[in-house]
Amino acid sequence: MSATLALTEQLIARASVTPDDQHCQQLMIERLAALGFECETIASHGVTNFWAVKRGTAGREGKLLAFAGHTDVVPTGPLEQWSSPPFVPTHRDGKLYGRGAADMKASLAGFVVAAEEFVAAHPQHRGSIGFLITSDEEGPATDGTVKVVEALAARGERLDYCIVGEPTSTATLGDVVKNGRRGSMSGELVVKGVQGHIAYPHLAKNPIHLLAPALAELAAEQWDEGNEYFPPTTWQVSNLRAGTGATNVIPGHADLLFNFRFSTASTVEGLQARVHAILDKHGLDYALNWSVSGLPFLTPRGELSNALDAAIRAETGLSPELSTTGGTSDGRFIARICPQVIEFGPPNASIHKIDEHIEVRFVEPLKNVYRRVLEQLIA
């Protein structure tokens, strides 16, 4: 069994349901410390994080490539629906089954073994290697990567490149990498009316009727046209509720929850202003609270994307598609202190599902891609 596969199995065997790390990080830290990494645990409100760095011969003047990822996994769902226990690594039909196999313990193992092989082959490497690992990516993500980024920023730590081990591949290893993600902004809208008997509408104000024209306009609005890297910004309603449940009462207010997934073609301030303008145009009496869970980030083609493309082609024969689709990731936090952030990992078809798995044949090439990028950028 390869070192990468063995470590993947060891990590899967630890039931690290978010935010419980179950000592996965300690296992990684022990391996990294043996290579000469300086390892620092950064805990926050029950979340375990660590930052590890091994300086190259150029010290802080050299480039720093960081691997970023998460040890936490989503809950298993009904255990009886799994073909084998989710935290017992199990091989069937050329696949390794277990919660976190694809998202993202194979990537974590690949990071560690790639670093081990690279340091053994290049003991005098010029650039530096970092690890930024959290147990709060699958949860609220309020005490994880963002806290490490804040700590690094406060001390002036600079990252030049970062690979996030998210499972970006689709049909096969290496067909897709993510060089950016859309931003996410939500709104909680309360439209105020006047409650009353449904038989006497002239004595009440129905907030649903008042909201409906504005809602139709918001749904039809084209917020932007996107750009070379991003599709157009989308606005979607996630929840609409009003009333007491009675059939003879006009509700006193209507509550609407909505979300923007927005590109670098729009700004938070611009989108908010346009929503308020539409609501105001319709004369609504309303309250609106905003929350921004992530800003969009984009890494244009450059040193990191070129190195990753070459490494993937060498291992798989594929030239990966650059994509910004999907939800948010911790890359949105890392982009604050790193100009080049790209996500790459195994196929994602089974993530978060019953019987999550990774094809065993992808484990070594995944590690090799990470090692090749190290060799190209910091050797």
Swiss-Prot record:
Cofactor note: Binds 2 Zn(2+) or Co(2+) ions per subunit.
Functional description taken from the UniProt entry: Catalyzes the hydrolysis of N-succinyl-L,L-diaminopimelic acid (SDAP), forming succinate and LL-2,6-diaminopimelate (DAP), an intermediate involved in the bacterial biosynthesis of lysine and meso-diaminopimelic acid, an essential component of bacterial cell walls.
Classification via InterPro entries: ArgE/DapE_CS, Bact_exopeptidase_dim_dom, DapE_proteobac, Peptidase_M20, Peptidase_M20_dimer, Peptidase_M20A
One Gene Ontology MF term: cobalt ion binding
Keyword annotations from UniProtKB, A to Z: Amino-acid biosynthesis, Cobalt, Diaminopimelate biosynthesis, Hydrolase, Lysine biosynthesis, Metal-binding, Zinc
Protein name: Succinyl-diaminopimelate desuccinylase
Keyword set includes Nuclease: no
Catalytic activity as recorded in UniProt: N-succinyl-(2S,6S)-2,6-diaminopimelate + H2O = (2S,6S)-2,6-diaminopimelate + succinate
Protein family according to the UniProt entry: Belongs to the peptidase M20A family. DapE subfamily.
UniProt source species: Burkholderia thailandensis (strain ATCC 700388 / DSM 13276 / CCUG 48851 / CIP 106301 / E264)
Keyword Hydrolase: yes
Gene name for this UniProt entry: dapE
Pathway in which the depicted protein is active: Amino-acid biosynthesis; L-lysine biosynthesis via DAP pathway; LL-2,6-diaminopimelate from (S)-tetrahydrodipicolinate (succinylase route): step 3/3
Subunit structure and binding partners: Homodimer.
Binding site residues for Zn(2+) 1: 70, 103, 166
Enzyme class: hydrolase
Swiss-Prot/TrEMBL cofactor(s): Zn(2+); Co(2+)
Entry's Gene Ontology BP terms: diaminopimelate biosynthetic process; L-arginine biosynthetic process; lysine biosynthetic process via diaminopimelate
Sequence intervals crossing the membrane: none
EC number: 3.5.1.18
HAMAP family per the UniProt record, alphabetical: DapE
Matching Pfam families: M20_dimer, Peptidase_M20
Positions bound to Zn(2+) 2: 103, 138, 352
